[in-house]
Design a protein with these regions (language model features):
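Helix-breaking motifs and short loop linkers at transmembrane-helix boundaries and internal kinks
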Residues: 49, 81, 102-108, 119, ...
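Conserved MFS/SLC helix-loop-helix module at the cytosolic interface between two early adjacent transmembrane helices
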Residues: 67-107
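Juxtamembrane intracellular "pre-TM" segments in multi-pass secondary transporters
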Residues: 5-12, 194-226
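Paired small-residue
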Residues: 92-99, 107-115, 315-323
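Helix-loop-helix hairpin linking two adjacent transmembrane segments in secondary transporters
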Residues: 108, 137-138, 142-191, 197
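Extracellular/periplasmic helix-loop-helix junction of adjacent transmembrane segments
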Residues: 39-68
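Cytoplasmic helix-loop-helix junction between adjacent transmembrane helices
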Residues: 112-153
Length: 422
């Protein structure tokens, strides 16, 4: 079947191609972050930055820019459709990546990174809205989890990609090659993706209407607790991401093996997404994610005890962080699915404002966690525990004090639209 508003000459996507395409759009953003990790020290030194923690800003500025930029694409996509917003984001991403490759000072790089992140935030927002256009309930959670599984190939490989480019061509070519990949993805989307927004769900661009839609998405009790909880959990991971090169490569002494350790941890996260995609329709998004949150808190408490004991080894740290990343994967797609479920008619605006709220919270707190790096794993471990406990309180708020409820019994989830995905 064709989607609403689809072009007859464009053949429908199969489910596998649809999932890989959505993952590829999100992966461009991840590539702009994770491929930079091995090059942070070199970039900072070559562009004249002297404070060792300032190198983290190459990552932190991008995360924050993506968070701020997430507020607008949903409203535009609810009016004009998903495709125009995607192509605008892809164009900005490509041009700014090329500009970053040509900078001559650290401040200019940070400014361009911020602008690139602001303008390309639709690459993160639109896949969630497109999936919501097509599916609901646990089926939507499975699709998001499967997309996240494919997407996780990039964080696994990106640091090694970045290190290889750094060694053979220099850090500027990392930006250049991300631009080339963006052009390739743009061509694919142009040729294969039909518009998924139902014309009946188009929203007018009126500030009052946009504000009402966004207010609706943020005032729903069943949703907002999950949005904020997700932001708190991911703040810990962003804190790790910001300081990972210093923490793993320098403090724990991984050195040139840092990309391998990072790939191993990210690979565990990918496997967790695979597990989630297989079990979520059987057990339900709430049961899976609530169990993961409780395990996250328990493991964070163990991390705190090991960090303050002062004898934590690289292997112990890597194993515990890999486990935490697995648990985050079991929460991520499920929290997103639960928080988007009430908003079928305003999926774009809801996805945008939720992504904005979640990302601003996680990027600001993650930046603060990264900047608090003191040569030990203590700040990170403490932040993971505090974030997990606060997230539990917020989930309990959204669930009226009851965990593990199953609202969509197995077999009752169904697609709500068919955008040519089958």
């Amino acid at each position: 079947m064709s989607s609403p508003g689809s072009t007859p000459s464009r053949p429908p996507l199969g489910e596998r191609e649809f999932i890989v395409m959505m993952a590829s759009l999100m992966a461009l953003q991840a590539l702009s972050i994770d491929s930079m990790l091995p090059a942070l020290g070199t970039i900072a030194a070559e562009l004249g930055s002297t404070d060792p923690n300032h190198r983290q800003l190459v990552i932190g500025v991008y995360l924050f820019g993506s968070a701020i930029g997430a507020l607008l694409p949903g409203a535009l996509a609810d009016r004009f459709g998903r495709r125009p917003v995607l192509f605008g984001a892809l164009a900005i991403y490509t041009v700014l990546a090329l500009a970053c490759a040509l900078v001559q000072d650290f401040t200019t790089l940070l400014v361009l990174r911020g602008i690139q992140a602001l303008g390309s935030a639709g690459l993160t927002v639109m896949p969630s809205a497109i999936v919501r256009d097509c599916h609901e309930g646990d089926r939507m959670a499975r699709m998001l989890s499967t997309t996240a599984l494919v997407f996780m190939i990039v964080p696994v490989l990106a640091p090694s990609f970045g290190q290889a480019v750094l060694q053979f061509a220099g850090w500027r070519w990392i930006f250049g090659l991300t631009a080339v990949l963006a052009v390739a993805v743009s061509s694919w989307v142009w040729l294969r993706l039909s518009e998924t927004l139902d014309p009946a769900n188009r929203q007018e661009i009126r500030p009052r209407r946009i504000a009402i839609n966004m207010g609706t998405a943020l005032s729903n009790r069943a949703s907002i607790g999950y949005v904020l909880a997700s932001g708190l959990v991911w703040a810990g991971l962003f804190g790790f991401l910001n300081s990972s090169q210093q923490l793993v490569a320098e403090h724990f002494g991984a050195g040139q093996a840092f990309p391998l350790y990072f790939a191993g941890m990210a690979g565990c996260m990918a496997m967790a997404n695979l597990v989630n995609s297989r079990i979520v329709e059987r057990f339900g998004a709430r049961r899976v994610s609530h169990s993961a949150l409780l395990a996250f808190i328990a493991l964070a408490a163990l991390q705190v005890s090991r960090a303050y004991a002062g004898d934590e080894t690289l292997g112990q740290f890597a194993l515990m962080m890999a486990a935490q990343m697995c648990l985050c994967a079991l929460m991520g797609a499920n929290f997103t699915s639960i928080s988007l479920q009430p908003f079928g008619r305003i999926a774009g605006a809801a996805a945008s404002v939720q992504m904005f709220t979640r990302s601003v919270l996680s990027s600001l707190l993650g930046g603060a966690i990264g900047q608090s790096f003191d040569g030990t794993a203590r700040p990170l471990a403490t932040a993971l525990l505090a974030g997990g406990l606060l997230a539990l309180v917020l989930v309990l708020y959204s669930e009226n004090g009851r965990l593990f409820r199953r609202l969509t019994p197995p077999g009752q989830a169904r697609p709500v639209a068919d955008p040519g995905v089958h």
